[in-house]
Structures are given as C-alpha cells and as structure tokens.
Amino acid sequence: MSGETYVGAIDQGTTGTRFMVFDHDGKVVANAYEKHEQIYPEPGWVEHDANEIWDNTKQVIDAALSSAGLDAEQLEAIGITNQRETTLVWDRETGQPIHNAIVWQDRRTTDRIETLEAEGKTDDVRAKTGLEPDAYFSATKAEWLLDNSDPIKLQRSRPEDIRDRAADGELAFGTIDTWLIYNLTGNHITDVTNASRTMLFNIHDMEWDDELLDEFNVPRELLPEVRPSSDDDYYGTTDADGFLGAEVPVAGALGDQQAALFGQTCFDAGDAKNTYGTGSFMLMNTGDEAVMSEHGLLTTVGFQRSGEPVQYALEGSIFITGAAIEWLEDMTLIDNAAESEKLARSVESTDGVYFVPAFTGLGAPHWDQRARGTIVGMTRGTRREHIVRATLESIAFQTRDVAEAMESDSEIDLSSLRVDGGAVKNNFLCQLQSNILDTEIVRPQVDETTALGAAYAAGLAVGYWETLDELRENWQVDREFAPKDPQNVEHRYGRWKEAVDRSLDWAREE
C-alpha cells in the first residue's frame, strides 16, 4: 500500500474506541477496536476513565496501521467522532483529569434539572439551546464536577477550591472530542456539533451563552474554542515526535450522531438517518433553519463546513436500544448479540409481552428521567424467546415514537430511512423496523458510517475529497427492506404505548 494516501477516523464510543482508515471510495482499509471499562460508582451513575480512553486511542491507531501495513505519513488527515455529552475537566498543566468522565447516561444530576423545572427556567434553556433540559447533557455534569471533584487529584501543594482554579483558567472543560484533540494537538478546541450538546451553547448565536454559564456556574475560562466540524484551518497537527511519529492534520470532528448523518450523506434538508448503537438516534437535516420541536424532539447543530452556514437537524434521542441487547447477555438470556435474531425468529410473536428498556429514564419524545425498565404481559408460558423478541420490538417501537414526532415537526413524511450502527446487521430487526414504521429501510454497504462521517469531514478540510458529490457517489446500498406482513402493527403499537405509560415516573422519591 506504499504510495497511497488515506484518511483516518477515531470513533470514540460509549463502550470502546475504534480507529478506521478509509480510501477515496470511502472503503475501509484498516480497522481496530478496544473496549474500555464501564464504572458504576452508585446506582444511576456511569463514569469512564479518560486516561484509559486516551491510551486505548493510541493503541487502536497503532494496531490499525500495523494490521494494514500503513505508515502514519500516509494519513492525509484524522477526523474524530465521539460519544456526545460525556464530560470531563482536566488540569491544563499536568494534562490529568480531576475526576473520571461523567458519561451521557449518568443520572446523578436529575435533581438539579428538577430544580431548574421548578424555577420555571426550562423554556429559556430550550429556546437558546434547542435541547430538552435533562441530566443527559453536559451543563449539569460540569457543574457537578466543579462542586464535587477531589482537589487532591490536582496533585498540587495547595489542594484548594477547584472553582477558583477553573476561574483562573488553570482547568479545561471538554467533551470527549475536546479531550482527544487536546491530547493529539495540544489545543483546547471543540466543534459546533459537540458544543451544541452541552446545554451551555446558544445554537442561534453560535457561541457560549453567558446566561447559561451563570445558571450552571461554569466559568468561561474553562471552555474550549468552538470551530467548524470540517475545518480548513485544522484544529492542529499531531506531534512528529509523538506516538504517531508524523505530523498529521486533525481537521474534522463531529458528535457521533451528527457524524453518522454526514457519513450517510444526509446533506440536504429532509434527509434522515437512524443509528442503532448503545442508544438510537434519529436525525433529520433541516437545512440552515433551526426548526424548534413541539413534539419532544431536540433541535441541534447538524454540521458546519468552513466558511459555510451551519446546517441544523431535528433529533430524537433514545437512550437504550443496543444496551437492551447487552442486558439480555448480562441476564444470560442470550450468549451474544447475534443469537437475538435467531431466538426472535423462533417464535411467531412476543405472546403479549412488551419490554420498555427505560434503564436510565426515557428520552424523546417522552423525556421522563424517572421512568424505569418495565416488562409487562408475562405469564407462566413466557419463554426467553418471547422476551428477546420483545426487546427487538422495543427498539422498533421507540423508533416509531420518534419518527411520528419528527414527521409532525418537519411536516415531511418519511418515505425512506437510512440506517447504520452495529444492530443493523440484524436482518430481523431491519425488517421489523420497516413493518412497524411502514417505511422503506435502507442499509448501506459501510455500516460504520459514524467513523466514515468523521473521515469525510477531515478529508474535505484538507482537500482529500473536493465536493459533497464525490461523497454521495461513494454511498452504496447493501440492502433495502420494504414493509410487509404487518401482523396487527397498529394494535401492537397501541399496546406498546400503554406499556410505556406503566414505566413512567417510577423512580420518584416517596
């Protein structure tokens, strides 16, 4: 492969880190993956070790390049995509985090959001950020870190108030993209898509919002510079004396769901995709208009290229989909994710069983932080096959909840939906989704479109690809699933909504 050049993408996800290398045709030429530990200090709390994530990032880059016989000099650029909202704060001098990263799934700041609601401030937050105020986003996580991190972890002679150090500019806040850009280039930068998920960023003015910073007591000195998702000026370059041994431009970054939108070439208003990962996230490009939702969806930044207007998106965030399959493994109902398809096919129906996987509350369009996982309709005749099938159906039903809200807000009927993510390898799920949505499901040949989107953003910035049309030509269909065999879909969907109602407000304090 000597002489050829490529673009690399770091895909830092909830459960692990991947590095992929793509050629001009958008084909994968190298790929490596490493899991990291999920840390659960208390019920409802989820943390990651940011140093472990950085170590794994270096490992997968080395492993991918080695496996394909590539040198770092053959990379024209690196793009980054990441689990969004996950939040950390680190010491600028030592580069060490002051606490584990607080993961997007973490619910420790639920009470803070309820205080915001009680004070009547949610409408203002929603108007500025496009987000439904929730512990999911970064603002309350950053506030918690500044209030609760152990100052001894700063490894200074004066273990004093972290807030003082933050105000003095000695600490840095970031989502995972910022952490990786910092470690790769030494620069403190985020992109517009990740900034839009912090609940501190005004998506209309496209800047950090002073009123929100005051509300959550986050000093501006803590914050990164906000740059386009595809940046002709680059975020910086890797160090020739560092682990890569080459100066490679780091030129693109997008939150994982926006990266998938970009990788699916959803460049025009009305284009939509659904990504099935730990959670599921449906995004529809709304062009240069920030369409504010009246049906429980989020309005967010889709992407921005250098010198061009911001492209916005409507988003339906479903917290638990693929993680429900992992739960089946944890409960030893299946040995691996692939077995779920076989078991689901082995029964004609769920036999009246409905599973609402609200392990961390419910996202769009319900937004109930105190909803909890619920299985209804079981009898003595219920078998594991029924529960497995009900789990897959829950993914499709939750997606329909979001799709109906999206059609109402956008006034666009979904005639086709592009899908990606690990779960779309499951043909049963794709067909089930088509039936329940009564919509064509289109699966691309490259299903890891999140990494591809990050590569496209970086590659466009350095001229590896010149136009969006080149990227559209790269997009190839693997399989299309047309609706068939509805099996009382409307009745089943009605029963699903009843099951959701049973799950709501369960974890309330007596």
Curated annotation (Swiss-Prot):
- Which EC number(s) are documented for this chain? 2.7.1.30
Q: Where does sn-glycerol 3-phosphate bind?
A: 14, 84-85, 136, 256
Annotated metabolic or biological route of this protein: Polyol metabolism; glycerol degradation via glycerol kinase pathway; sn-glycerol 3-phosphate from glycerol: step 1/1
Q: Which GO terms describe its molecular function?
A: ATP binding; glycerol kinase activity
- Record field: catalytic activity: glycerol + ATP = sn-glycerol 3-phosphate + ADP + H(+)
| Cellular component GO terms held in the UniProt record | cytosol
**Record's PROSITE patterns?**
FGGY_KINASES_2
SUPFAM superfamilies, per the entry: Actin-like ATPase domain
Q: What happens when the gene is disrupted?
A: Incapable of growth on glycerol. Causes a reduction in growth on dihydroxyacetone.
A Gene Ontology biological process term: glycerol-3-phosphate metabolic process
The record's comment on protein family reads: Belongs to the FGGY kinase family.
- PANTHER family, alphabetically? GLYCEROL KINASE, SUGAR KINASE
Q: What is this protein called?
A: Glycerol kinase
Q: Which organism is it from?
A: Haloferax volcanii (strain ATCC 29605 / DSM 3757 / JCM 8879 / NBRC 14742 / NCIMB 2012 / VKM B-1768 / DS2)
- This chain is encoded by the gene named glpK
